[in-house]
Regions:
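Thiol-/selenol-based redox modules, centered on thioredoxin-like
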Residues: 130-185
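N-terminal targeting signals for export/organelle localization
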Residues: 1-20, 185
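Short active-site neighborhood of thiol/selenol oxidoreductases, capturing the structured segment around
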Residues: 29-59, 74-76
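Structural micro-motif
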Residues: 103, 114, 121, 125-126, ...
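Structural microenvironment flanking redox-active thiols in thiol-disulfide oxidoreductases
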Residues: 56-116
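Short loop/turn microsegments at loop-to-beta-strand junctions
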Residues: 16-17, 39, 138-140
Length: 185
């Protein structure tokens, strides 16, 4: 495990790639919808049997830490848009007791989603018929600031961590701390 500088200021990794998808309420949501907000991006799918339930339980904890914060949001982007329709995402959101109006479960064009994940965010997603669930992806969360820049801590060697581990308590706690930092910037 890399040791991460607990008090490090957040560095800027780069601009968030542009995206535009449809959320669980059938509204068009783009990166511009989050202008002026601090937000977190993840890639998941509703029928994921392994890491997604852990990721979204942790994301719910993050949501609950910022329930009254109108300048905070979450973009949960499905990598199985053929199955994860607006209706399916709406039901899924209920399962996780999504009450923060800025938590958007997003679906859209398959190729756009895969390009966004693999090239835009450098977060691997892929179809993998041999694995349970049929898709592969990482458990990482990406933090974006009010100006649309990807932000992160640095490790003890001064290298950016870039992503937060959405499967580990430590990663989630760091993310909550860093969201607070950005909201106060």
């Amino acid at each position: 495990r890399k040791s991460i500088d607990k008090d490090s200021k957040l560095i800027t990794i780069g601009e968030v790639p542009a995206f535009q998808f449809i959320n669980q309420n059938n509204d068009t949501i783009s990166n511009r919808s989050f202008a002026g907000k601090v937000y977190v991006v993840e890639f998941f799918f509703t029928t994921c049997p392994s890491i997604c339930p852990i990721m979204n339980q942790n994301m719910k904890e993050i949501q609950n830490a910022f329930l009254d914060e109108k300048n905070f949001g979450i973009a949960s982007i499905t990598i199985n848009p053929l199955y994860d329709t607006v209706e399916v995402l709406k039901e899924y959101a209920k399962t996780y007791e999504v009450v923060q109006p800025n938590w958007h479960f997003l679906t859209g064009n398959h190729n756009e989603i895969y390009t966004l994940a693999n090239e835009g965010f450098n977060l691997y997603v892929g179809e993998a018929p041999e694995v349970e669930g049929g898709f592969e992806h990482s458990g990482f969360f990406t933090l974006i600031d009010q100006n649309g820049n990807i932000r992160s801590r640095i490790d003890a060697n001064g290298n950016p961590i870039i992503y937060y581990d959405g499967l580990e308590k430590e990663g989630v706690e760091m993310l909550i701390t860093d969201i607070k930092k950005l909201l106060n910037e």
